[in-house]
């Protein structure tokens, strides 16, 4: 399975071979998460490194990103495109999330970062694009991420407009995965080429972007006076006793900042001008005793900022460095420039207008790939109540997707949950009917 992974052109996205590889990557992603959460030997990571497939995954990640920007945009504007099912389209859109999720799981390891080779720069640029978009979005992001909808099956085609909303919802999750990947790259920056450090610090000024993300904290919000935090793909209400507890995403941002600002090799290369200095000093207001108790290493960052506030940073020495440059984005754009509409029309005919028989076959394969027992095992923590955020042991009998700690919470939450429950139940029913017909 791993040895067969390959790069596809934008034109061949959604082809039979491409969908087969998508299923492979989904299964690899699930197995990697299971191994990591269970503390088992991470065979998937080892196989991907041994067979040199990390660059392949990064190339495919950027390829689908470009497809969404260039081809999907055209598809949504085609007046005569009314697909029987948007499931194939959704699978392409979801492919990007699958790959970044797999990379997040395995990039914790130094050998994975090193095996990305020249495409580390491409991955850094990708993460920077996603994090910049996250920082620039308005407070409407919660609505997008919370109301992610399941695509309908062949019996009930959802609109392309709805699919666009699903794509936007996925962007939020993708950006949060990119935050973790950025942190892991910063962990191993001393074993990566100098061009990686320069791109993080001076080309993109990642520390300033991380400051902005900590300031905005897009993974927390308040609704009707109730603090909520985003975790494992959902918003959860936070009990009063946990409101000062650092989230995993806060921790990723702080650790990345610690690495980029305090490692000696980074301090020698980072060009801190007056603007950057002002941005970094904003961090001092966040470094409370409560935060330092949870992440004691940040005391060193506090000292660094205190020193920075009373000193003028020395510009780094100008050295002649032959740097690598990212190539994947420009290569794909240049190869397909002026062809986006033609590619979209080709894919409408060849990939996104399947016969009833093809849809049944796809539904059967997807049902096998997204096995519910396996999906539940991917969640390392116990489920939380959709109403109050406490640990939950009961779930909705209709859709099987929402959890509650007690019946009172389920009754209270029903009006909010009803629409999603109806859609999930209907989608599951339709898929089962398709599989039964095929059988």
From Swiss-Prot:
GO biological process, one term: positive regulation of motile cilium assembly
Pfam families per record: zf-MYND
Gene Ontology molecular function, alphabetical: zinc ion binding
Residues at which Zn(2+) 2 binds: 396, 399, 417, 421
ZnF locations on chain (MYND-type): 385-421
Binding residues annotated for Zn(2+) 1, in chain numbering: 385, 388, 405, 409
Quaternary state and interactors: Interacts with LRRC6.
Protein function: Plays a role in axonemal structure organization and motility. Involved in axonemal pre-assembly of inner and outer dynein arms (IDA and ODA, respectively) for proper axoneme building for cilia motility. May act by indirectly regulating transcription of dynein proteins.
Family: Belongs to the ZMYND10 family.
Protein name: Zinc finger MYND domain-containing protein 10
Originating organism: Xenopus laevis (African clawed frog)
């Amino acid at each position: 399975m791993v040895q067969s992974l390959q790069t596809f052109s934008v034109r061949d996205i959604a082809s039979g071979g491409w969908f087969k590889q998508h299923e492979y990557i989904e299964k690899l992603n699930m197995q990697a998460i299971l191994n990591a959460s269970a503390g088992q030997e991470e065979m998937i990571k080892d196989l991907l490194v041994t067979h040199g497939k990390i660059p392949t995954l990064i190339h495919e990640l950027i390829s689908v990103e470009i497809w969404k920007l260039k081809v999907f945009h055209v598809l949504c504007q085609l007046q005569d495109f009314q697909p029987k099912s948007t499931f194939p389209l959704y699978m392409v859109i979801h492919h990007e999330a699958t790959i970044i999720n797999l990379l997040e799981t395995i990039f914790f390891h130094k050998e994975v970062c090193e095996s990305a080779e020249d495409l580390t720069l491409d991955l850094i640029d990708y993460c920077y694009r996603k994090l910049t978009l996250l920082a620039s979005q308005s407070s409407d992001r919660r609505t997008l991420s919370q109301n992610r909808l399941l695509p309908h099956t062949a019996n009930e085609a959802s609109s392309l407009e709805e699919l666009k909303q699903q794509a936007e919802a996925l962007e939020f999750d993708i950006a949060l995965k990119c935050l973790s990947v950025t942190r892991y790259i910063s962990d191993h920056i001393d074993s990566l080429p100098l061009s990686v450090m320069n791109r993080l610090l001076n080309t993109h000024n990642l520390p300033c972007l991380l400051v902005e993300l900590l300031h905005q904290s897009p993974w927390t919000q308040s609704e009707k006076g109730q603090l909520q935090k985003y975790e494992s793909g959902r918003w959860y209400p936070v009990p009063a006793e946990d409101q000062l507890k650092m989230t995993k995403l806060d921790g990723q941002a702080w650790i990345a900042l610690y690495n980029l600002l305090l490692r000696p090799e980074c301090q020698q290369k980072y060009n801190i001008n007056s603007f950057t200095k002002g941005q970094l000093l904003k961090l001092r207001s966040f470094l409370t005793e409560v935060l330092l108790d949870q992440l004691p290493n940040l005391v060193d960052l506090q000292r660094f900022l205190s020193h920075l506030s009373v000193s003028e940073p020395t510009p780094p020495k100008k050295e002649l460095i032959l740097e690598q440059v990212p190539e994947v984005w420009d290569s794909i754009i240049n190869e397909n420039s002026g062809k986006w509409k033609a590619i979209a029309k080709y894919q409408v005919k060849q990939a996104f207008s399947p016969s009833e028989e093809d849809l049944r076959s796809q539904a059967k394969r997807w049902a096998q790939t997204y096995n519910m027992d396996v999906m539940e095992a991917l969640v390392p923590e116990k489920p939380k109540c959709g109403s109050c955020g406490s640990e939950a042991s009961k779930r909705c009998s209709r859709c099987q997707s929402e959890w509650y700690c007690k019946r009172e919470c389920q009754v209270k939450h029903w009006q909010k949950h009803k629409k999603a429950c109806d859609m999930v139940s209907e989608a599951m029913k339709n898929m089962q009917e398709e599989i039964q017909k095929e059988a």
